[in-house]
Amino acid sequence: PAGILAGGEVALRISGVGYPASLFIKEKLSDREILRANYRVGYRFFPGKLARKPLPEIMPAVKPAGRLRFFVLGESAARGEQLADFSFSRMLEAAINDHSPEKKVEVINTGIPAINSWVLREFADEVLDLQPDLLIIYAGHNEFIGPYGPASVFGLARNRLAALTGIWASTLRLVQV
């Protein structure tokens, strides 16, 4: 049975069924590699039209020399919902670059409305692999009602193992279909 499931998963991935489960997707743009925020990552935690999306952030896959790269992880407040151009991450980036023009700082805002620490835990691992110079977590508003929270309608989990299993399963194409 495990071999059949593994074979089905591989076949679905090869045939392009489902979507990437990571927060960022590596792509080629002209002659350089970039990382683009995965607009479908919210499908892991929310059904269909209720899925939330990250901002359309794009950055070089390899951080340019001399540039500082900061990441903001969080919910709608971190995102700057409804006016992301006025989020604290955009203001932080502008303030640092205005105050110290010799230091180039980019602030990548990964805020997604309605998520909580179960989701942020997944994203933090991926962001830390990108070796940020600073990681800011602005969260706490959705712990009760967000995915796998005690009052959630999206993937209720009664314990840690159930939540982690559900999050892992959401990366499988067999579950996405």
Place the predicted regions along the sequence by residue.
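Hydrophobic membrane-insertion alpha-helices, especially the h-region
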Residues: 1-10
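Membrane/wall-proximal cationic-aromatic binding patches
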Residues: 15-100
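Structural recognition of the beta-strand scaffold that forms the well-ordered cores
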Residues: 69-72, 106-111, 134-138
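Solvent-exposed loop/turn segments at secondary-structure junctions
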Residues: 76-79, 112-117, 141-146
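Serine-dependent acyl-ester chemistry module
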Residues: 86, 141-177
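Structural motif
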Residues: 107, 113-124
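Short, well-structured alpha-helical segments in soluble
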Residues: 120-134
